[in-house]
C-alpha cells in the first residue's frame, strides 16, 4: 500500500497536470472560435468560384483543359493535412489511417504514388514508414493566410499539369461541430465531376475560353487546398479542446480517488496509533 507521502505527491502532481490541461483547453477554445469563423467565411468564396468555373467549363461547348480531362493513371498524389503538434485526440491518427488504407488498396509499389505533407505529424509518419514525401510544409500558423499555403499548393497543382501526377487526392478533417470532425477524401484533380450549383451563367470570353481556364482552374484547385486547410485547422482546435477537457475531467476524478485513498490511509494510520497506545497502556496496568 502506498504511503501517505506518496499519495500526497501524486495528488499534487495531478493537480498541476490538470491546471495545464485546463489552460490548453481554454487556449484551444479561443483558437477554435476564430478558426471556425475563418472556415465559414471562406465558403461563399468557394461557392462563387465553383459557380464561375462550372459555368465557364460546362456552359460552352468545346471547353478543353488538361485539368478537366481524366487520363491513364500511372502515379497518384496524396495531399494530407495534419497538425504540427499532438495532444489532439484521434485527429491525426484517423486521417493517417484513412490515407494508409487507400495507399495499400490502390498501389503495389512506391513508384505509383507520392505524398504532399502539410503538417509535421503527417510528415514524420510517412517518412518513418518509407512512404515518399515529395513536398512538405510545417510550422503553419494557427490561423493561416492563403499566402502561407500558396507556394506548396501551386507546386502541387503544377505537378499535375506537368504529368508528375495523373490524379490528386486531398485528405483533411472536415469540421462539423465542436465534438464531431469527419475525415474527408476529395478528388482534387482532374476536375471531372464539376456540377453546376444552379443555372449555368453565360459569359462572353475575352481573349478566349481556354486562356481563362488556364488561369482560373489552377486558382480553383489551390483554393480547394486552402479551404481544406482552414477546415482542418478548425477541426484540430476542436479535437484538442475536447481532448484537453477529457484529460482535465479525468484528472479531477483521479484527484478525488487519491484524496479518498489518502483519507482512508490517514484514518488507518491514526487508528493503528490509537490501538498501539491503548495496547501499551493496558500492558502497563
From Swiss-Prot:
GO MF entry, a single one: proton-transporting ATP synthase activity, rotational mechanism
Coiled-coil regions listed in the entry: none
PROSITE patterns xrefs: ATPASE_GAMMA (PS00153)
GO-annotated cellular components: plasma membrane; proton-transporting ATP synthase complex
Membrane topology field: Peripheral membrane protein
Subcellular location: Cell membrane
UniProt keyword Nucleotide-binding, yes or no: no
The entry's keywords: ATP synthesis, Cell membrane, CF(1), Hydrogen ion transport, Ion transport, Membrane, Transport
Signal sequence region: none
Source organism, top-level taxon: Bacteria
SUPFAM superfamilies in alphabetical order: ATP synthase (F1-ATPase), gamma subunit
InterPro entries for this protein: ATP_synth_F1_ATPase_gsu (IPR035968), ATP_synth_F1_gsu (IPR000131), ATP_synth_F1_gsu_CS (IPR023632)
Biological processes per GO annotation: proton motive force-driven plasma membrane ATP synthesis
Presence of keyword Isomerase: no
UniProt function note: Produces ATP from ADP in the presence of a proton gradient across the membrane. The gamma chain is believed to be important in regulating ATPase activity and the flow of protons through the CF(0) complex.
Subunit annotation: F-type ATPases have 2 components, CF(1) - the catalytic core - and CF(0) - the membrane proton channel. CF(1) has five subunits: alpha(3), beta(3), gamma(1), delta(1), epsilon(1). CF(0) has three main subunits: a, b and c.
Similarity comment: family membership: Belongs to the ATPase gamma chain family.
Protein name: ATP synthase gamma chain
Organism of provenance: Priestia megaterium (strain ATCC 12872 / QMB1551)
The gene coding this protein: atpG
